[in-house]
């Protein structure tokens, strides 16, 4: 399959270092709001990259909260990503909003949020999603789809109203140490503004594309 001639020439906007917020979290929130306003497809979807036994893996996960400390998502702690995080608590996140010709890359340390925070989020999930969190042994081999459906039915019968949060399911927060904002530009002269956390303070700089 020849893909040599598939390319886009970006030209919608530019990114000025002077106009970027001093705090990259605020800059991210602005870009995320603009992606939502522009009706970007799945604006909160992000690639989460981890390393397990020295080998990188990645998957798409939905961002569920941004706060001054970092970026929060929820998952099964016993999943492959959970095992990787337990072994190596450093991850990378990537957002891509094609509609705005923008990308954000985030690198940092990851840790679990409190059980209370996970409980509060889990309680607000749809009933079927709460059942699914119990039914799925995420990343484990299934003999058939019917096995999963049957297990979900049993859990629903056991918990017809209130489904408690599984102890192996909850939230993580990524505490950023490096955040890069990328804006596509003509002739591949893209804008890249990078923030690095140095001794507790954010340093902002422009990178060559």
UniProtKB/Swiss-Prot annotation:
Keywords: Flavoprotein, FMN, Oxidoreductase, Pyridoxine biosynthesis. Substrate binds at residues 7-10, 64, 121, 125, 129, 188-190. Binds 1 FMN per subunit. Its cofactor is FMN. This is Pyridoxine/pyridoxamine 5'-phosphate oxidase. The lineage of its organism: Bacteria, Pseudomonadati, Pseudomonadota, Gammaproteobacteria, Pasteurellales. GO terms for biological process: pyridoxine biosynthetic process. Pfam families: PNP_phzG_C (PF10590), PNPOx_N (PF01243). Pathway: Cofactor metabolism; pyridoxal 5'-phosphate salvage; pyridoxal 5'-phosphate from pyridoxamine 5'-phosphate: step 1/1; Cofactor metabolism; pyridoxal 5'-phosphate salvage; pyridoxal 5'-phosphate from pyridoxine 5'-phosphate: step 1/1. The keyword Flavoprotein applies. GO terms for molecular function: FMN binding; pyridoxamine phosphate oxidase activity.
């Amino acid at each position: 399959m020849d893909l040599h001639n598939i390319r886009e020439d970006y030209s919608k906007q530019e990114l000025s270092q002077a106009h970027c917020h001093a705090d990259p979290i605020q800059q991210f929130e602005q870009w995320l709001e603009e992606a939502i306003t522009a009706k970007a497809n799945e604006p909160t979807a992000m690639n989460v990259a981890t390393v397990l036994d020295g080998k990188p893996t990645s998957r798409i996960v939905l961002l569920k909260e941004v706060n001054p400390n970092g970026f929060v998502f929820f998952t099964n702690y016993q999943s492959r990503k959970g095992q990787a995080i337990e072994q190596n608590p450093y991850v990378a996140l990537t957002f891509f909003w094609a509609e705005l010709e923008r990308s954000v890359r985030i690198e940092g340390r990851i840790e679990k949020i409190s059980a209370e925070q996970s409980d509060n989020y889990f309680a607000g999930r749809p009933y079927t999603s709460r059942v699914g969190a119990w039914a799925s042994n995420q990343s484990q081999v299934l003999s058939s789809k019917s096995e999963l459906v049957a297990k979900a039915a049993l859990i629903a019968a056991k918990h017809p109203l209130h489904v408690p949060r599984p102890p192996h399911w909850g939230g993580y927060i990524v505490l950023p140490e490096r955040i890069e904002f990328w804006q596509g530009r003509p002739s591949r002269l893209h804008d890249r503004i990078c923030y690095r956390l140095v001794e507790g303070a954010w340093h902002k700089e422009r990178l060559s594309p």
